[in-house]
Protein backbone atom coordinates (compact mmCIF):
# COMPACT_ATOMS: atom_id res chain seq x y z
CA UNK A 1 0.00 0.00 0.00
CA UNK A 2 1.35 3.42 -0.93
CA UNK A 3 2.31 5.74 1.91
CA UNK A 4 -0.51 8.13 2.74
CA UNK A 5 0.04 11.86 2.45
CA UNK A 6 -2.25 12.81 5.33
CA UNK A 7 -2.63 16.44 4.31
CA UNK A 8 -3.77 15.54 0.79
CA UNK A 9 -5.80 12.54 1.90
CA UNK A 10 -7.83 14.55 4.40
CA UNK A 11 -9.51 16.41 1.52
CA UNK A 12 -11.52 13.26 0.83
CA UNK A 13 -13.12 13.20 4.27
CA UNK A 14 -16.73 14.27 3.76
CA UNK A 15 -20.21 13.00 4.63
CA UNK A 16 -21.23 10.04 2.53
CA UNK A 17 -23.32 6.85 2.55
CA UNK A 18 -21.96 3.42 3.47
CA UNK A 19 -24.10 1.98 0.65
CA UNK A 20 -25.66 -0.95 2.43
CA UNK A 21 -28.45 -0.04 0.02
CA UNK A 22 -29.00 2.06 -3.08
CA UNK A 23 -30.96 4.25 -3.03
CA UNK A 24 -29.96 4.81 0.60
CA UNK A 25 -32.44 4.70 3.48
CA UNK A 26 -32.67 8.51 3.33
CA UNK A 27 -34.72 8.04 0.15
CA UNK A 28 -37.23 5.62 1.70
CA UNK A 29 -40.72 7.20 1.64
CA UNK A 30 -44.02 6.49 3.38
CA UNK A 31 -45.85 6.16 0.05
CA UNK A 32 -44.25 2.71 -0.16
CA UNK A 33 -46.77 0.95 2.06
CA UNK A 34 -48.25 -2.46 2.83
CA UNK A 35 -49.93 -2.75 -0.56
CA UNK A 36 -46.65 -1.83 -2.27
CA UNK A 37 -44.90 -4.62 -0.39
CA UNK A 38 -47.60 -7.18 -1.17
CA UNK A 39 -47.29 -6.30 -4.85
CA UNK A 40 -43.52 -6.70 -4.64
CA UNK A 41 -43.95 -10.08 -2.93
CA UNK A 42 -46.35 -11.23 -5.68
CA UNK A 43 -43.97 -10.11 -8.44
CA UNK A 44 -41.00 -11.87 -6.85
CA UNK A 45 -42.97 -15.07 -6.21
CA UNK A 46 -43.93 -15.20 -9.89
CA UNK A 47 -40.53 -14.61 -11.46
CA UNK A 48 -39.52 -17.31 -13.94
CA UNK A 49 -36.77 -18.32 -11.50
CA UNK A 50 -37.72 -16.99 -8.05
CA UNK A 51 -34.63 -16.00 -6.12
CA UNK A 52 -33.78 -17.67 -2.80
CA UNK A 53 -34.64 -16.00 0.48
CA UNK A 54 -32.54 -14.35 3.16
CA UNK A 55 -34.28 -13.90 6.51
CA UNK A 56 -33.24 -11.06 8.81
CA UNK A 57 -34.87 -10.87 12.25
CA UNK A 58 -34.32 -7.86 14.47
CA UNK A 59 -34.17 -8.54 18.22
CA UNK A 60 -33.95 -4.99 19.54
CA UNK A 61 -33.46 -5.22 23.30
CA UNK A 62 -30.34 -4.30 25.28
CA UNK A 63 -29.91 -4.12 29.03
CA UNK A 64 -27.82 -0.93 28.83
CA UNK A 65 -26.55 1.56 26.27
CA UNK A 66 -23.21 1.30 24.48
CA UNK A 67 -22.49 4.95 23.71
CA UNK A 68 -20.93 4.28 20.29
CA UNK A 69 -23.83 2.20 18.94
CA UNK A 70 -25.85 3.43 15.97
CA UNK A 71 -28.17 0.42 15.86
CA UNK A 72 -31.89 0.55 16.50
CA UNK A 73 -32.21 -0.61 20.11
CA UNK A 74 -34.65 -0.58 23.02
CA UNK A 75 -33.20 -0.51 26.53
CA UNK A 76 -34.97 -2.67 29.09
CA UNK A 77 -34.48 -5.23 31.82
CA UNK A 78 -38.13 -6.29 31.84
CA UNK A 79 -38.81 -9.91 30.99
CA UNK A 80 -42.40 -9.18 29.97
CA UNK A 81 -41.19 -6.94 27.12
CA UNK A 82 -39.33 -9.85 25.56
CA UNK A 83 -42.31 -12.18 25.97
CA UNK A 84 -44.61 -9.59 24.38
CA UNK A 85 -42.20 -9.02 21.49
CA UNK A 86 -42.10 -12.74 20.69
CA UNK A 87 -45.90 -12.79 20.47
CA UNK A 88 -45.80 -9.94 17.93
CA UNK A 89 -43.09 -11.64 15.88
CA UNK A 90 -45.49 -14.58 15.57
CA UNK A 91 -48.26 -12.23 14.39
CA UNK A 92 -45.95 -10.82 11.72
CA UNK A 93 -44.90 -14.28 10.60
CA UNK A 94 -48.56 -15.30 10.19
CA UNK A 95 -49.17 -12.27 7.97
CA UNK A 96 -46.04 -12.98 5.92
CA UNK A 97 -47.25 -16.54 5.35
CA UNK A 98 -50.44 -15.17 3.79
CA UNK A 99 -48.66 -12.46 1.79
CA UNK A 100 -45.95 -14.45 0.00
CA UNK A 101 -44.71 -17.90 -0.93
CA UNK A 102 -42.83 -18.86 2.23
CA UNK A 103 -41.90 -22.28 0.83
CA UNK A 104 -39.12 -20.82 -1.30
CA UNK A 105 -35.58 -21.88 -0.45
CA UNK A 106 -33.92 -20.02 2.45
CA UNK A 107 -30.14 -19.65 2.07
CA UNK A 108 -29.40 -17.06 4.77
CA UNK A 109 -30.77 -16.56 8.27
CA UNK A 110 -29.55 -13.81 10.58
CA UNK A 111 -30.34 -12.49 14.05
CA UNK A 112 -29.32 -8.88 14.61
CA UNK A 113 -29.94 -6.42 17.36
CA UNK A 114 -29.98 -5.09 19.88
CA UNK A 115 -28.58 -8.07 21.72
CA UNK A 116 -30.07 -11.32 20.38
CA UNK A 117 -28.61 -13.30 23.30
CA UNK A 118 -30.34 -10.96 25.75
CA UNK A 119 -33.24 -13.32 25.03
CA UNK A 120 -32.99 -16.55 27.01
CA UNK A 121 -31.96 -19.79 25.26
CA UNK A 122 -35.55 -21.03 25.53
CA UNK A 123 -36.87 -17.81 23.99
CA UNK A 124 -34.33 -17.92 21.14
CA UNK A 125 -35.37 -21.50 20.45
CA UNK A 126 -39.04 -20.47 20.41
CA UNK A 127 -38.37 -17.63 17.96
CA UNK A 128 -36.28 -19.82 15.66
CA UNK A 129 -38.87 -22.59 15.65
CA UNK A 130 -41.64 -20.10 14.85
CA UNK A 131 -39.69 -18.79 11.86
CA UNK A 132 -38.81 -22.27 10.62
CA UNK A 133 -42.45 -23.32 10.77
CA UNK A 134 -43.39 -20.49 8.40
CA UNK A 135 -40.24 -20.71 6.21
CA UNK A 136 -39.57 -24.48 6.25
CA UNK A 137 -37.38 -24.88 3.17
CA UNK A 138 -33.91 -24.32 4.61
CA UNK A 139 -31.05 -24.98 2.18
CA UNK A 140 -28.58 -27.75 3.00
CA UNK A 141 -25.75 -25.18 3.02
CA UNK A 142 -27.68 -22.34 4.66
CA UNK A 143 -25.70 -19.61 6.41
CA UNK A 144 -27.21 -19.22 9.88
CA UNK A 145 -25.65 -16.38 11.83
CA UNK A 146 -26.20 -14.51 15.08
CA UNK A 147 -24.67 -11.40 16.61
CA UNK A 148 -23.14 -12.13 20.01
CA UNK A 149 -22.51 -9.84 22.96
CA UNK A 150 -19.92 -11.75 25.06
CA UNK A 151 -21.43 -10.20 28.20
CA UNK A 152 -24.69 -12.07 27.53
CA UNK A 153 -23.57 -15.43 26.15
CA UNK A 154 -23.84 -18.73 27.99
CA UNK A 155 -23.23 -22.38 27.22
CA UNK A 156 -27.02 -22.79 27.09
CA UNK A 157 -27.22 -20.09 24.40
CA UNK A 158 -24.54 -21.89 22.41
CA UNK A 159 -26.29 -25.23 22.77
CA UNK A 160 -29.56 -23.75 21.50
CA UNK A 161 -27.89 -22.08 18.51
CA UNK A 162 -26.01 -25.29 17.70
CA UNK A 163 -29.16 -27.41 17.94
CA UNK A 164 -30.95 -25.04 15.55
CA UNK A 165 -28.17 -25.23 12.96
CA UNK A 166 -26.34 -21.93 13.46
CA UNK A 167 -22.88 -22.04 11.91
CA UNK A 168 -21.67 -18.43 12.02
CA UNK A 169 -21.26 -16.11 14.99
CA UNK A 170 -20.25 -12.46 15.04
CA UNK A 171 -18.78 -11.14 18.29
CA UNK A 172 -18.97 -7.46 19.20
CA UNK A 173 -15.43 -6.69 20.40
CA UNK A 174 -14.78 -3.05 19.40
CA UNK A 175 -11.54 -2.62 21.40
CA UNK A 176 -9.78 -4.46 24.24
CA UNK A 177 -8.33 -1.30 25.82
CA UNK A 178 -10.00 -0.70 29.20
CA UNK A 179 -9.89 3.11 28.87
CA UNK A 180 -11.68 2.88 25.53
CA UNK A 181 -14.24 0.43 26.91
CA UNK A 182 -14.90 2.73 29.85
CA UNK A 183 -15.42 5.73 27.54
CA UNK A 184 -17.98 3.84 25.43
CA UNK A 185 -19.76 2.23 28.42
CA UNK A 186 -19.01 -1.37 27.44
CA UNK A 187 -16.67 -3.27 29.74
CA UNK A 188 -15.75 -6.76 28.51
CA UNK A 189 -12.27 -8.08 29.38
CA UNK A 190 -10.24 -10.11 26.92
CA UNK A 191 -10.79 -13.23 29.02
CA UNK A 192 -14.58 -12.89 28.61
CA UNK A 193 -14.31 -12.78 24.83
CA UNK A 194 -11.74 -15.58 24.87
CA UNK A 195 -14.12 -17.81 26.82
CA UNK A 196 -16.99 -17.07 24.42
CA UNK A 197 -14.87 -17.82 21.36
CA UNK A 198 -13.61 -21.07 22.88
CA UNK A 199 -17.19 -22.09 23.55
CA UNK A 200 -18.12 -21.45 19.92
CA UNK A 201 -15.08 -23.38 18.66
CA UNK A 202 -15.87 -26.30 20.98
CA UNK A 203 -19.27 -26.55 19.29
CA UNK A 204 -17.68 -26.58 15.85
CA UNK A 205 -18.77 -23.12 14.66
CA UNK A 206 -17.05 -22.84 11.29
CA UNK A 207 -17.04 -19.07 10.88
CA UNK A 208 -16.27 -16.56 13.64
CA UNK A 209 -16.28 -12.83 12.96
CA UNK A 210 -15.17 -9.97 15.21
CA UNK A 211 -16.60 -6.47 14.94
CA UNK A 212 -13.94 -3.86 15.72
CA UNK A 213 -14.24 -0.07 15.59
CA UNK A 214 -11.55 2.55 15.08
CA UNK A 215 -12.04 6.22 15.91
CA UNK A 216 -13.46 5.61 19.41
CA UNK A 217 -12.69 7.89 22.38
CA UNK A 218 -9.28 7.32 24.02
CA UNK A 219 -8.07 5.27 21.06
CA UNK A 220 -4.50 5.63 19.83
CA UNK A 221 -2.62 3.89 17.04
CA UNK A 222 -0.44 2.05 19.54
CA UNK A 223 -3.43 1.03 21.64
CA UNK A 224 -5.41 -0.27 18.67
CA UNK A 225 -2.45 -2.29 17.40
CA UNK A 226 -2.28 -3.86 20.85
CA UNK A 227 -5.97 -4.77 20.50
CA UNK A 228 -5.17 -6.40 17.15
CA UNK A 229 -2.43 -8.46 18.80
CA UNK A 230 -5.01 -9.75 21.28
CA UNK A 231 -7.41 -10.40 18.40
CA UNK A 232 -4.86 -12.61 16.64
CA UNK A 233 -4.59 -14.78 19.75
CA UNK A 234 -8.27 -15.67 19.23
CA UNK A 235 -7.82 -16.40 15.52
CA UNK A 236 -11.14 -15.15 14.06
CA UNK A 237 -11.93 -16.12 10.48
CA UNK A 238 -13.16 -12.66 9.55
CA UNK A 239 -12.97 -9.13 10.87
CA UNK A 240 -15.23 -6.17 10.30
CA UNK A 241 -13.29 -3.03 11.20
CA UNK A 242 -15.68 -0.11 11.12
CA UNK A 243 -14.94 3.59 11.08
CA UNK A 244 -16.76 5.04 14.10
CA UNK A 245 -19.49 7.36 12.88
CA UNK A 246 -20.04 10.09 15.47
CA UNK A 247 -23.56 11.33 14.68
CA UNK A 248 -24.98 12.63 17.98
CA UNK A 249 -27.70 14.51 16.08
CA UNK A 250 -29.00 11.07 15.03
CA UNK A 251 -28.20 8.88 18.07
CA UNK A 252 -28.76 10.57 21.42
CA UNK A 253 -26.57 8.09 23.34
CA UNK A 254 -23.55 9.39 21.41
CA UNK A 255 -23.99 12.72 23.21
CA UNK A 256 -22.60 10.96 26.29
CA UNK A 257 -19.22 10.59 24.56
CA UNK A 258 -16.67 13.24 25.46
CA UNK A 259 -15.80 14.61 22.02
CA UNK A 260 -12.45 15.89 23.28
CA UNK A 261 -11.39 12.25 23.65
CA UNK A 262 -12.11 11.35 20.01
CA UNK A 263 -9.08 10.86 17.74
CA UNK A 264 -8.49 13.64 15.22
CA UNK A 265 -9.14 12.91 11.52
CA UNK A 266 -5.38 12.55 11.03
CA UNK A 267 -5.11 10.17 13.99
CA UNK A 268 -7.95 8.06 12.55
CA UNK A 269 -6.18 7.85 9.21
CA UNK A 270 -2.97 6.78 10.92
CA UNK A 271 -4.88 4.08 12.81
CA UNK A 272 -6.50 2.91 9.56
CA UNK A 273 -3.20 2.77 7.69
CA UNK A 274 -1.55 0.90 10.57
CA UNK A 275 -4.36 -1.63 10.99
CA UNK A 276 -4.44 -2.48 7.28
CA UNK A 277 -0.67 -3.03 7.27
CA UNK A 278 -0.81 -5.08 10.49
CA UNK A 279 -3.62 -7.34 9.30
CA UNK A 280 -2.10 -7.94 5.88
CA UNK A 281 1.14 -9.06 7.54
CA UNK A 282 -1.00 -11.44 9.61
CA UNK A 283 -2.46 -12.83 6.33
CA UNK A 284 -5.86 -11.18 6.59
CA UNK A 285 -6.88 -9.78 3.21
CA UNK A 286 -8.91 -6.59 2.84
CA UNK A 287 -12.46 -7.19 1.60
CA UNK A 288 -14.38 -4.19 0.32
CA UNK A 289 -14.09 -1.09 2.46
CA UNK A 290 -14.10 -2.45 6.01
CA UNK A 291 -13.84 -6.25 6.14
CA UNK A 292 -10.85 -8.58 6.36
CA UNK A 293 -10.69 -12.34 5.86
CA UNK A 294 -8.06 -15.04 5.89
CA UNK A 295 -6.57 -15.91 2.51
CA UNK A 296 -8.39 -19.25 2.41
CA UNK A 297 -11.74 -17.78 3.48
CA UNK A 298 -14.64 -17.92 1.04
CA UNK A 299 -15.00 -14.12 1.10
CA UNK A 300 -11.46 -13.60 -0.16
CA UNK A 301 -11.82 -16.37 -2.74
CA UNK A 302 -15.03 -14.75 -4.02
CA UNK A 303 -13.25 -11.39 -4.17
CA UNK A 304 -10.63 -12.90 -6.48
CA UNK A 305 -13.44 -13.83 -8.87
CA UNK A 306 -15.22 -10.46 -8.41
CA UNK A 307 -18.26 -12.37 -7.13
CA UNK A 308 -18.78 -10.68 -3.76
CA UNK A 309 -22.09 -9.06 -2.95
CA UNK A 310 -23.04 -6.57 -0.25
CA UNK A 311 -26.29 -6.21 1.67
CA UNK A 312 -27.51 -4.97 5.04
CA UNK A 313 -25.86 -7.95 6.75
CA UNK A 314 -22.45 -7.18 5.23
CA UNK A 315 -20.50 -8.99 2.51
CA UNK A 316 -21.65 -12.35 1.22
CA UNK A 317 -20.76 -14.94 -1.40
CA UNK A 318 -24.42 -15.77 -2.01
CA UNK A 319 -26.01 -14.82 -5.30
CA UNK A 320 -28.70 -12.18 -5.11
CA UNK A 321 -31.40 -13.05 -2.59
CA UNK A 322 -34.69 -11.50 -1.60
CA UNK A 323 -34.30 -10.36 2.00
CA UNK A 324 -37.34 -10.60 4.25
CA UNK A 325 -37.11 -8.29 7.25
CA UNK A 326 -38.85 -9.52 10.40
CA UNK A 327 -39.34 -7.47 13.54
CA UNK A 328 -39.34 -3.82 14.49
CA UNK A 329 -37.22 -1.53 12.22
CA UNK A 330 -36.03 -4.44 10.05
CA UNK A 331 -35.28 -3.81 6.38
CA UNK A 332 -36.27 -6.03 3.47
CA UNK A 333 -34.87 -5.98 -0.03
CA UNK A 334 -35.84 -7.30 -3.43
CA UNK A 335 -34.49 -6.83 -6.91
CA UNK A 336 -36.45 -3.59 -7.33
CA UNK A 337 -37.55 -2.44 -3.88
CA UNK A 338 -36.57 -1.80 -0.27
CA UNK A 339 -38.97 -1.83 2.66
CA UNK A 340 -38.61 -0.98 6.33
CA UNK A 341 -40.81 -1.89 9.27
CA UNK A 342 -41.87 0.69 11.84
CA UNK A 343 -38.96 1.86 14.00
CA UNK A 344 -41.26 2.69 16.89
CA UNK A 345 -42.35 -0.40 18.83
CA UNK A 346 -45.81 1.00 19.58
CA UNK A 347 -46.54 1.64 15.90
CA UNK A 348 -45.13 -1.78 14.99
CA UNK A 349 -47.49 -3.48 17.45
CA UNK A 350 -50.48 -1.35 16.46
CA UNK A 351 -50.14 -2.27 12.78
CA UNK A 352 -50.01 -5.97 13.65
CA UNK A 353 -52.99 -5.67 16.00
CA UNK A 354 -54.95 -4.29 13.05
CA UNK A 355 -53.86 -7.19 10.86
CA UNK A 356 -51.44 -5.18 8.71
CA UNK A 357 -47.85 -5.88 7.76
CA UNK A 358 -45.90 -3.28 9.80
CA UNK A 359 -44.49 -1.36 6.82
CA UNK A 360 -43.48 2.20 7.65
CA UNK A 361 -41.68 3.20 4.46
CA UNK A 362 -39.67 1.98 1.51
CA UNK A 363 -38.83 2.70 -2.10
CA UNK A 364 -39.64 1.15 -5.46
CA UNK A 365 -36.59 1.24 -7.73
CA UNK A 366 -36.70 2.59 -11.27
CA UNK A 367 -34.70 0.82 -13.97
CA UNK A 368 -32.07 3.55 -13.62
CA UNK A 369 -31.94 2.93 -9.87
CA UNK A 370 -31.41 -0.80 -10.45
CA UNK A 371 -28.60 -0.04 -12.91
CA UNK A 372 -26.82 2.37 -10.57
CA UNK A 373 -27.34 0.01 -7.63
CA UNK A 374 -25.53 -2.73 -9.56
CA UNK A 375 -22.61 -0.41 -10.35
CA UNK A 376 -22.29 0.87 -6.79
CA UNK A 377 -22.60 -2.56 -5.18
CA UNK A 378 -19.96 -4.01 -7.52
CA UNK A 379 -17.63 -1.17 -6.57
CA UNK A 380 -18.32 -1.50 -2.85
CA UNK A 381 -17.83 -5.26 -2.92
CA UNK A 382 -14.98 -5.85 -5.35
CA UNK A 383 -13.15 -2.48 -5.49
CA UNK A 384 -13.23 -2.67 -9.27
CA UNK A 385 -15.69 -2.74 -12.13
CA UNK A 386 -15.85 -4.62 -15.41
CA UNK A 387 -17.97 -2.56 -17.80
CA UNK A 388 -19.01 -5.63 -19.80
CA UNK A 389 -20.81 -7.18 -16.82
CA UNK A 390 -23.03 -4.11 -16.56
CA UNK A 391 -23.46 -3.78 -20.32
CA UNK A 392 -24.54 -7.42 -20.74
CA UNK A 393 -27.05 -7.25 -17.91
CA UNK A 394 -28.61 -3.87 -18.76
CA UNK A 395 -27.98 -3.47 -22.51
CA UNK A 396 -26.22 -0.12 -22.09
CA UNK A 397 -23.02 1.40 -23.41
CA UNK A 398 -21.30 1.99 -20.07
CA UNK A 399 -18.90 4.72 -21.19
CA UNK A 400 -21.68 6.65 -22.91
CA UNK A 401 -24.24 6.21 -20.12
CA UNK A 402 -21.82 7.18 -17.36
CA UNK A 403 -19.68 9.69 -19.23
CA UNK A 404 -20.00 12.39 -16.53
CA UNK A 405 -19.36 9.93 -13.70
CA UNK A 406 -16.22 8.57 -15.35
CA UNK A 407 -14.93 12.12 -15.77
CA UNK A 408 -15.41 12.64 -12.02
CA UNK A 409 -13.19 9.61 -11.37
CA UNK A 410 -10.25 11.12 -13.30
CA UNK A 411 -8.86 13.02 -10.27
CA UNK A 412 -8.66 9.71 -8.39
CA UNK A 413 -6.63 8.28 -11.27
CA UNK A 414 -4.33 11.30 -11.25
CA UNK A 415 -3.82 10.85 -7.49
CA UNK A 416 -2.82 7.20 -7.97
CA UNK A 417 -5.96 5.88 -6.27
CA UNK A 418 -7.64 4.35 -9.31
CA UNK A 419 -6.37 2.64 -12.46
CA UNK A 420 -8.37 2.60 -15.68
CA UNK A 421 -7.91 -0.37 -18.01
CA UNK A 422 -9.51 -1.44 -21.31
CA UNK A 423 -12.18 -3.45 -19.46
CA UNK A 424 -13.04 -0.95 -16.72
CA UNK A 425 -11.27 0.33 -13.63
CA UNK A 426 -9.75 -0.92 -10.39
CA UNK A 427 -8.90 0.85 -7.15
CA UNK A 428 -5.40 0.68 -5.74
CA UNK A 429 -4.96 -0.62 -2.18
CA UNK A 430 -4.94 2.93 -0.87
CA UNK A 431 -7.77 3.89 -3.21
CA UNK A 432 -9.90 1.14 -1.71
CA UNK A 433 -10.04 3.21 1.47
CA UNK A 434 -11.98 5.77 -0.59
CA UNK A 435 -14.45 3.41 -2.22
CA UNK A 436 -17.36 5.29 -0.63
CA UNK A 437 -16.16 8.53 -2.22
CA UNK A 438 -15.86 6.94 -5.65
CA UNK A 439 -19.23 5.21 -5.38
CA UNK A 440 -20.79 8.57 -4.54
CA UNK A 441 -19.95 9.78 -8.04
CA UNK A 442 -22.57 7.31 -9.34
CA UNK A 443 -25.24 8.28 -6.79
CA UNK A 444 -28.01 10.22 -8.53
CA UNK A 445 -29.62 11.28 -5.25
CA UNK A 446 -26.81 13.11 -3.48
CA UNK A 447 -27.48 16.79 -3.20
CA UNK A 448 -24.37 17.84 -1.30
CA UNK A 449 -24.00 19.21 2.20
CA UNK A 450 -26.32 16.67 3.80
CA UNK A 451 -25.82 15.78 7.45
CA UNK A 452 -27.53 12.42 7.17
CA UNK A 453 -24.27 10.56 6.69
CA UNK A 454 -21.07 9.93 8.60
CA UNK A 455 -17.74 11.07 7.16
CA UNK A 456 -16.04 8.75 4.70
CA UNK A 457 -12.76 8.90 6.64
For each predicted feature, which ranges?
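C-terminal scaffold of the Radical SAM
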Residues: 52, 76-99, 106-396, 456
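Flexible, acidic/Gly-rich N-terminal and inter-domain linker regions that tether
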Residues: 1-53, 102
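Short amphipathic alpha-helical interaction segments
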Residues: 397-411
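A short, conserved structural fragment
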Residues: 413-423
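Minor-groove-contacting beta-hairpin "wing" of winged helix-turn-helix DNA-binding domains
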Residues: 424-428
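Short, amphipathic alpha-helical interaction segments positioned at domain boundaries
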Residues: 432-457
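Local cysteine-cluster metal-coordination motifs and their immediate loop/turn environment
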Residues: 57-73
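Short alpha-helical scaffolding segments that buttress acidic/His motifs in well-ordered protein cores
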Residues: 69, 374-376, 438
Amino acid sequence: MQTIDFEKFSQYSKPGPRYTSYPTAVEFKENFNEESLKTAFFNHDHLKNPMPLSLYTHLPFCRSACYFCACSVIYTSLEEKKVRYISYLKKELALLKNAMDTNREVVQFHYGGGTPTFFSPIQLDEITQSIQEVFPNFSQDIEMSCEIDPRHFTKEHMQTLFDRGFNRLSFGVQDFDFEVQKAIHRIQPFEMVQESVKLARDYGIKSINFDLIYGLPNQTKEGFLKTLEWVLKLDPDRLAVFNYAHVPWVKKTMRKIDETLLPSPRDKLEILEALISFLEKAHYQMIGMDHFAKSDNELYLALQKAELRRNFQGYTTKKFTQTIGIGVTSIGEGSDYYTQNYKDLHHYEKALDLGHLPVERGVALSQEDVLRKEVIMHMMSNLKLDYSKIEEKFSVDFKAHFKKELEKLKPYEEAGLLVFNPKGFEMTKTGGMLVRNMAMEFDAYLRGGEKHFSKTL
